[in-house]
């Protein structure tokens, strides 16, 4: 019954597809292979540079591309969703059987194993994306089962799985390492059978042979090293990349943190009990528990190894029950374990947010625009609809740079069109190319050389997150350059075209007065009323389009300009009419509304809006001061005192806040 509950919960967790942009690459790669009848090894996905020689492209994920392209032709995105679910369920079913074997005859361990399986599933759920790493996860999960039930049949089953794995993902290297660990002599006191090591050695031979026979072959290790070298170069220039962001550990509120905490405790228990110190179980757990602290992306890899390891720990803690009969207390323990996992990690068992890109090569309708999408989804759709972006420079949400490919179109009546793709594969670039792309952001001369060599005609830029963001200086360089014209912007991105672009003459759509790019890098709005009026007029025209009407950030800029002119009534009229979801911009808009109502002495409305804007993690001294004034006017003196404390914590020398604090203290308000 407990295993049935775990299986149902895992099946529910596989519902809903979050399409990563990597799917576009694998569709393209698989389509090229099927069309050409061979595996391409040319580095043709990136902007060519005349002084950088092309590099051999190992294409070690070629088979995954073929499978994804075939499935997509058969069932579209629903087929890819099904493929994703099958890989995830297969992986954790392997892990479940391995956990059952590891639990042995201990009734407590067998009843707790489903809860541990769900915990591992919940911890890994952040990586349930339709990408080749799911093949690696399924392969590694199969290995956790085979090493615990070695035999010739297992080796025979591993042969096709290894060939599939080696041609789908580079992390077959993890499988080889895992199999090698199981060659370590067992000194735990619970020795494996004498001939088990022979089968483990056979597993290593099968995996290594499969990797050597893949198109990547001997390049696999070099590819991994190239990836980390690219990461080092990025970090040195101040960028970050989610692919190598280490997991932060907090021992509460997270299924992955709980999984890691339990695994550490189990390893330490085995270490200090001495008799279980050096054995494959402990060494493999110790090796794979480190991976999430290198990159949080590896939590799914660690989960499939740690869950079977943990499944045997209850039997080791209570060795007297190892051969006992199951009792109601064991069932209660298992039910409570499952309930705890479902309670503390329920979101992973519900359909995730579906962020599916529009069918490739087809103009997206106006209602497909999603202002709240990830950078730079909407910008790419704008470029595609207008036939732009042939020579594009930008980066994606991970800090990687844009490449190109001919995108297959889901509608047979539409011809394939060239469309940008966000390349997450630094290892496919020559070192010089990576370095030139990155230096172009921080060095003006390097940027001019790169833009000339690659004939770049389009730029997509993200909004800089803070003053130290490397893109901030690049944005300043582009925003004040006569060579580039701002033609489109939304809540996540700014789009520029070269001033010589024919599209500018044909469409004539540019932003000359409404320039949020310049306002961001200078922190200065237009000085004259005439300039502010011109900027407002441009933004109003932009908001009249289906796309512009969904951009929330434009409301912020318009409200700022109106408040600078002292027009509180127009600000309220503008913002109160908003009926769309404001997402991450809600606090900012609430702050504008609160200030506007305060200027009209409508203190209750001002207090309500400012209280929302000042919720954590707000850190604006002016916002807290405005909230304190509104609270005091509404006679919420305790709230006013708290807001003043937060204000002075941000800026201890804020003179008006100090005056208000003295006034409240003189009135005998508690807290001063």
Predicted regions and their residues:
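Membrane-interface alpha helices of multi-pass inner-membrane proteins
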Residues: 9-10, 120-124, 141-146, 155-170, ...
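Transmembrane catalytic cores of multi-pass membrane glycosyltransferases
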Residues: 22, 34, 39, 170-272, ...
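Short hydrophobic/aromatic helix or loop-helix immediately within or flanking a transmembrane segment
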Residues: 48-78, 82, 86
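Membrane-interface transmembrane helices that cradle and orient dolichyl/undecaprenyl
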Residues: 140-156, 266-275
């Amino acid at each position: 019954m407990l295993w049935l509950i775990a299986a149902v919960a895992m099946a529910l967790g596989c519902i809903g597809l979050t399409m990563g942009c990597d799917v576009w690459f694998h569709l393209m790669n698989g389509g090229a292979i099927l069309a050409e009848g061979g595996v391409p090894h040319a580095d043709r996905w990136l902007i060519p540079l005349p002084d950088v020689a092309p590099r051999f492209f190992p294409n070690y994920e070629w088979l995954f591309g073929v499978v994804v392209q075939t499935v997509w032709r058969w069932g579209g995105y629903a087929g890819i969703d099904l493929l994703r679910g099958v890989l995830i369920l297969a992986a954790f079913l392997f892990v479940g059987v391995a956990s059952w074997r590891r639990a042995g005859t201990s009734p407590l361990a067998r009843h707790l194993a489903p809860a541990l399986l769900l915990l591992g599933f919940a911890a890994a759920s952040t990586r349930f994306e339709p990408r080749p790493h799911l093949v690696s996860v399924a392969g590694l999960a199969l290995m956790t089962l085979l090493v615990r039930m070695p035999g010739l049949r297992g080796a025979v089953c591993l042969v096709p799985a290894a060939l599939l794995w080696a041609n789908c993902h580079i992390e077959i290297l993890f499988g080889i390492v895992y199999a090698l660990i199981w060659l370590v002599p067992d000194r735990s006191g619970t020795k494996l059978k004498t001939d088990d090591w022979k089968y483990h050695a056979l597993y290593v031979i099968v995996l290594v042979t499969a990797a050597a026979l893949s198109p990547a072959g001997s390049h696999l290790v070099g590819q991994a090293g190239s990836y980390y070298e690219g990461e080092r170069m990025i970090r040195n220039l101040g960028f970050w990349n989610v692919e190598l962001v280490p997991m932060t550990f907090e021992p509460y509120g997270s299924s992955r943190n709980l999984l890691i905490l339990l695994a550490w405790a189990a390893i330490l228990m085995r270490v200090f009990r001495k008799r279980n110190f050096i054995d494959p179980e402990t060494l493999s757990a110790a090796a794979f528990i480190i991976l999430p602290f290198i990159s949080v992306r590896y939590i799914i890899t660690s989960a499939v190894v740690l869950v079977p390891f943990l499944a045997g720990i209850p039997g080791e803690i209570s060795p007297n029950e190892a051969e006992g009969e199951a009792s109601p207390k064991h069932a209660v323990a298992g039910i409570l374990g499952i309930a705890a996992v479902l309670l503390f990690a329920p979101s992973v068992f519900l359909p995730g947010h579906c962020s599916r890109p529009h069918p490739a090569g087809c103009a997206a309708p106006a209602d497909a625009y999603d202002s709240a999408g990830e950078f730079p989804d909407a910008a790419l759709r704008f470029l595609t609809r207008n036939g732009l972006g042939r020579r594009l420079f930008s980066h994606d949400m991970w800090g990687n740079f844009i490449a190109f490919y001919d995108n297959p179109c889901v509608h047979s009546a539409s011809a394939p069109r060239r469309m940008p793709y966000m390349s997450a594969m630094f290892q496919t670039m020559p070192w010089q190319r990576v370095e030139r792309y990155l230096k172009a952001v921080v060095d003006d001369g390097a940027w001019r050389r790169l833009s000339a060599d690659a004939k770049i005609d389009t730029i997509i830029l993200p909004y800089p997150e803070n003053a130290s963001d490397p893109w901030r200086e690049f944005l300043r360089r582009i925003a004040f350059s006569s060579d580039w014209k701002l033609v489109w912007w939304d809540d996540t991105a700014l789009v520029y075209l070269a001033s010589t672009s024919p599209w500018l003459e044909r469409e004539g759509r540019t932003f000359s007065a409404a320039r949020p790019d310049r306002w961001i890098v200078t922190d200065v709005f237009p000085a004259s009323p005439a300039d502010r009026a011109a900027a407002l007029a441009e933004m109003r025209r932009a908001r009249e389009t289906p796309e512009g009407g969904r951009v929330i950030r434009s409301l912020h800029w318009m409200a700022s300009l109106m408040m600078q002119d002292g027009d509180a009534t127009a600000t309220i009229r503008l913002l109160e009419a908003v009926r769309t979801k404001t997402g991450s911009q809600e606090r900012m808009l609430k702050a504008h509304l609160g200030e506007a109502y305060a200027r009209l002495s409508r203190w209750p409305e001002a207090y309500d809006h400012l209280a929302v804007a000042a919720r954590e993690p707000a850190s604006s001294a002016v916002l807290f001061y405005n909230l304190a004034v509104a609270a005091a006017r509404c006679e919420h003196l305790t709230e006013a005192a708290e807001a003043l404390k937060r204000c002075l914590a941000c800026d201890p020398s804020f003179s008006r806040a100090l005056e208000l604090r003295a006034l409240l203290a003189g009135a005998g308000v508690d807290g001063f």
